[in-house]
Each structure stands twice: as structure tokens, then as C-alpha cells.
């Protein structure tokens, strides 16, 4: 499913856990204003190197997702392709609180995570019910899984 073709993405996009940065770069090439964050300094260095020769609307930052105070209400769209399900259980609440902080009432969050029913990929990841509960506790209302 292509969120761009479906018209689901809006101007200011956050790519959470942006390695290998192809989503951030692709969306920036289409004119979206994109911020790509990853906790890995190496991932961000690679992303910056890849985009250094491109004119683009993408800004990469090495950050802990739970520390995005300067972006209050900034993002129209957040995409998370595999970040949330790979963080520690103890980081779920700070992560979802940050989502609530950086989004506004009309923002959309697109979260892709491993499924417990896909046994070939399942490696003690937390289930979707746990994700949904953490998101609801922090008032993240628009969510596509």
C-alpha cells in the first residue's frame, strides 16, 4: 500500500527510526518537508552522506525519539516503519508521549510493526494490543496499523 498514492501523507513528515533513510529521501523528493530521526549516530551519518549532493527537503537528526520538545504540534504525518516494535518496553510510554506532543489534532501516525501471527518474523516482540494501549494512554487517536 502506497500512502502517497492514497493521499494519506501531508506536508510536514517525521520519519521515526529513519535508517536506511529511503522513505525520508523519497518523500523529500516529492516535495514533503521531512525530518528523519534515528538514535544511531552511524545511521544519521550515512543518511547525511547520501543526501549531501541532493537538493532536498529532508533534515536528518540523531535523536532519542522521546526528546523532541522543539517540535510541539509540528508534524502532520509520522511514519514509523519498524522503530516502535524494536524499542525496549520501558521506552513505549516516553515514545507515545512524544508522539502526542509532536502531533496536532489532525495529524496521522502510520506505524508498521511485526505481527505476533507471523511466526517467521516473531522474536519476542510485544503484541499490537500492548502498542495500542500505550498509544491510547497518550491520546494518539489517529492510527493505522
From Swiss-Prot:
The keyword Transferase applies. The keyword Chloroplast does not apply. It is an enzyme of class 2 (transferase). It comes from the Eukaryota. GO terms for cellular component: cytosol; nucleus. Its EC number is 2.1.1.-. GO terms for biological process: methylation. One of its GO terms (molecular function) is methyltransferase activity. Keywords: Methyltransferase, Transferase. Belongs to the methyltransferase superfamily. Probable methyltransferase. This is Uncharacterized methyltransferase C1348.04. It comes from Schizosaccharomyces pombe (strain 972 / ATCC 24843).
Amino acid at each position: 500500500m502506497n500512502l502517497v498514492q492514497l493521499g494519506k501523507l501531508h506536508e510536514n513528515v517525521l520519519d521515526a527510526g529513519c535508517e536506511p533513510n529511503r522513505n525520508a529521501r523519497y518523500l523529500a523528493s516529492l516535495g514533503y518537508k521531512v525530518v528523519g530521526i534515528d538514535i544511531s549516530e552511524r545511521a544519521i551519518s550515512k543518511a547525511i552522506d547520501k543526501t549531501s549532493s541532493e537538493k532536498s527537503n529532508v533534515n536528518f537528526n540523531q535523536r532519542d525519539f522521546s526528546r523532541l520538545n522543539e517540535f510541539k504540534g509540528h508534524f502532520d504525518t509520522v511514519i514509523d516503519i519498524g522503530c516502535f516494535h524494536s524499542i525496549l518496553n520501558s521506552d513505549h510510554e516516553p515514545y507515545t508521549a512524544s508522539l502526542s506532543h509532536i502531533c496536532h489534532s489532525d495529524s496521522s501516525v502510520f506505524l508498521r510493526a511485526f505481527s505476533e501471527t507471523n511466526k517467521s518474523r516473531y522474536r519476542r516482540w510485544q503484541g499490537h494490543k500492548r502498542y495500542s494501549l500505550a498509544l491510547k494512554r497518550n491520546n494518539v487517536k489517529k492510527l493505522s496499523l
